[in-house]
Amino acid sequence: MNKLRILLLARHATVTLAHSRTADVAAHTREADIVVCATGRARAYGPEYFSPGQTVLDVGINFDAAGNLCGDVDFGAVEPVLGPEGAITPVPRGLGGVTTSVTMAHVVQAAEAGQR
């Protein structure tokens, strides 16, 4: 997450990082254009955290009480709030493929660098 923060700041974005002791996280997330959720808590973020037109990137990989794979965001409850102008990444079949691809690219780069 730190690398993403640095990249966004380099583009003059205002970056807010929330944690477990941040007061009223929902007030911060409702005002953001882009929200990245990466807390590791199944469906912890419901519709009260979001506003129409936002882009929500759900990085969380969790299992709910029934054993189903899910993200940090309650996708079914949040997607209607975002509306047609908004977007949300699903879990599964969302950012996981990107993460795997980037990780493999780094492994290949490291292997190639080691052969030089």
Each language-model region and where it sits:
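Glycine-rich phosphate/diphosphate-binding loop of Rossmann-like nucleotide-binding domains
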Residues: 1-55, 68-70, 75, 79
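Rossmann-fold NAD(P)-binding glycine/threonine-rich loop
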Residues: 57-115
